[in-house]
Every structure is written in C-alpha cells, then in structure tokens.
C-alpha cells in the first residue's frame, strides 16, 4: 500500500483528495495535517465523508512514515515548508499550489500535466500539479502546438464554478452575489497564463503569441467550460485526426463529435474536447471539473504514474449529470 500524508486538509481540494484516497485500492492515508483543525474529526470539516473516514486532523508531521506527501496549501506555503523542513530523500511530493509550476534551476519539480509530461512524471520525485484553468486550456491547445500551428494570438474565454475561489468566503463567493450572476475577473492577467505559455513553448519552441484569456465567475459550484479560437486553414477532419492521435494513449481526454456540456465532466477526472471549423477559425471547446481534473483528480493521476500504477486506478468516476 502507498502510505500518504496531506498538508493543508481543510479546503475543497483537500476534501476531494481525501475522498479519492480513501476509495483508492492502493492507498492508505497516514495523516492529514491542519494546524487550524488539529484534534478535530475530518468529518467536522468535510461532512460529505460521514461513514467513510474516521481520521482526525493532526498538527504532527510523521514524514518518515509515508511514501507520498500532498500539499493542499495556500500559494507560497509549500515553498516555505520545503525550505524549512528536512524532507526524507525518498519521499515523493505532489504540490497542488502554484509554487513550483514554472521551471527553474532552483528546484527539481516536474510540471505534472500527464498529457504533456507523462514520461518525466513517471520517474519524478517532486511534481507540481497544474492549475485548473491552465489544465483545461492547455488540453485544448497541446495538439496544435505539437504540429507547430500556434502562430497567432489565441483567444480564450473560460468560466469557472465558485469552488475555484477556495473554501474561505469572500465578497464574490457569497450565494446572494454569485447566484444568477456572472462577472469577469483578472482579464488578460490571470496567474495561470505563464504556465500555459511554458507548456506550449515546450512543444512549439517558436511560440511567442499571446494567450488572450478572459476568465469568468459562474453561478454554479464546480467545473470549467472554456472556448478557444485559433486561426488556421487546415481542414477540420485533419485537425480532429491530430487531436485523436495526440490523446490516443491518454485515458482521461476524449474528442467528442457532438457539442459538449459541463455536466458531462463534473465529478470526473475527464476532459472533453469538441472541435468546430467556421471559415478560417477553429473553435475548440474544452471542459473539466476544476476540483478533479483541475486539482485533486490530477494529483492522484500523477501519484498513480509516480508509483507505476495503471493511471485510472481510483479515478473511474461517474459524472453527476443527474
């Protein structure tokens, strides 16, 4: 059994990670660290786990007793922890924050998008889990970058559910504001754009165009629905073939002939992609669950690869479409 520890156990991504790990046939949770909830039952915070989890939060860190450590911490906290603690040499780490997503000679974290870096992830000791928007958008663009087709600015509009803002309530996450409402935030300035560009440049070294990304807050709890527009004269049939070939060995990305809906992916680790051609404009529609494929599900996917398990173990999930 893979023995796992979690640091930062009170948020939405941690709750989903706990749910996935307690139902994973090859994993045992050894500890869930939360300084603000130490001594409390997990179900005091994650009430959806009643009857499934009898663990309590702890402020202890028995790192020698685990094989893999997940960070579900605020941005900046993982880096502080890594710099201030003695990490066992063989301990594998999966960081769900943005601290190590950008490659640097100062760290050895692999960018953990399996559909891009599968081979490197399989042998990695430290993995940086991608951002939710970044995952959804990259999966819509990677095949084009592979074929050196991203030579002009890419227009992206994407809407996310309220869980993307985290568990702490804020002015834009209260039900009375969010319900029946929609708004733009961080237009052209979202923090996930650098990691998107990094990945595209990895496949297409000549890529120097802009990702003109406009994020929206939606009035639903979870999921990301993105539309991307790229100019190309290549026929739709050829583009579909490129996408199907690129994702042929990836279990969680599916190219769909019919138009797609967000509810087809909510509560799953899937990404669905639909392609349309309108004149010289290619419309790419990509959707994921922000908490699963965009966070905790992808973290478990990375764990499976790091421990040489079949990638879908513990991730065969039914969408909550009805």
UniProtKB/Swiss-Prot annotation:
Q: What is its main location?
A: cytoplasm
What Gene3D superfamilies does the entry give?
Dihydrodipicolinate Reductase, domain 2 (3.30.360.10), NAD(P)-binding Rossmann-like Domain (3.40.50.720)
Q: What class of enzyme is it?
A: oxidoreductase
One Pfam family, short name please? Semialdhyde_dhC_1
Q: Where is the active site?
A: 132
Instruction: Please tell me one Gene Ontology term that the record gives under cellular component.
Output: cytoplasm
Its recorded reaction(s) are: N-acetyl-L-glutamate 5-semialdehyde + phosphate + NADP(+) = N-acetyl-L-glutamyl 5-phosphate + NADPH + H(+)
**Protein localization:** Cytoplasm
Pathway note: Amino-acid biosynthesis; L-arginine biosynthesis; N(2)-acetyl-L-ornithine from L-glutamate: step 3/4
Keyword vocabulary terms for this entry: Amino-acid biosynthesis, Arginine biosynthesis, Cytoplasm, NADP, Oxidoreductase
Give the family per the record: Belongs to the NAGSA dehydrogenase family. Type 1 subfamily.
Sorted alphabetically, the Gene Ontology BP terms of this entry are: L-arginine biosynthetic process
Protein source organism: Bacteroides fragilis (strain YCH46)
Q: Which GO terms describe its molecular function?
A: N-acetyl-gamma-glutamyl-phosphate reductase activity; NAD binding; NADP+ binding
- Matches recorded under InterPro entries: AGPR_AS, AGPR_type-1, NAD(P)-bd_dom_sf, NAGSA_dehydrogenase, Semialdehyde_DH_NAD-bd
Provide the function of this protein: Catalyzes the NADPH-dependent reduction of N-acetyl-5-glutamyl phosphate to yield N-acetyl-L-glutamate 5-semialdehyde.
Task: Provide the protein name.
Answer: N-acetyl-gamma-glutamyl-phosphate reductase
EC number(s) of the enzyme? 1.2.1.38
């Amino acid at each position: 059994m893979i023995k796992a520890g979690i640091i930062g156990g009170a948020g939405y991504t941690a709750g989903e990670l706990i749910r996935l790990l307690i139902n994973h046939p090859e994993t045992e949770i050894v500890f869930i660290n939360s300084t603000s909830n130490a001594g409390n039952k997990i179900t005091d915070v994650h009430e959806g786990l009643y009857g499934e989890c009898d663990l309590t939060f702890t402020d202890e860190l028995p790192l020698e007793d685990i094989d893999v450590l997940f960070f579900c911490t605020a941005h900046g906290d993982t880096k502080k922890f890594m710099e201030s603690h003695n990490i066992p040499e063989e301990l594998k780490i999966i960081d769900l924050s943005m601290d190590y997503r950008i490659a640097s000679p100062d760290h050895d974290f692999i960018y953990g998008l399996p559909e891009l870096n599968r081979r490197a992830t399989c042998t990695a000791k430290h993995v940086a889990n991608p951002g939710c928007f970044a995952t959804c958008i990259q999966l819509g663009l990677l095949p084009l970058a592979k074929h050196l087709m991203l030579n002009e600015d890419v227009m992206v509009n994407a809407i996310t559910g309220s869980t993307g803002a985290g568990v702490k309530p804020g002015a834009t996450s209260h039900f009375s504001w969010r319900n029946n409402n929609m708004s733009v935030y961080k237009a052209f300035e979202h923090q996930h754009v650098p990691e998107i560009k990094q990945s595209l440049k990895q496949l297409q070294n000549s890529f120097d165009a802009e990702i003109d990304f406009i994020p929206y807050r939606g009035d639903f709890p979870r999921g990301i629905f993105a539309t991307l527009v790229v100019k190309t004269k290549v026929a739709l049939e050829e583009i579909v073939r490129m996408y199907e070939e690129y994702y042929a060995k990836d279990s969680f990305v599916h190219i769909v002939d019919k138009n797609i809906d967000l509810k087809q992916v909510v509560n799953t680790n899937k990404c669905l992609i639909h392609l349309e051609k309108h004149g010289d404009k290619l419309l790419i529609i990509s959707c994921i669950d922000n908490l699963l494929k965009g966070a905790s599900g992808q973290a478990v996917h990375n764990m499976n690869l790091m421990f040489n398990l079949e990638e879908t173990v513990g991730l065969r999930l039914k969408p909550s479409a009805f």
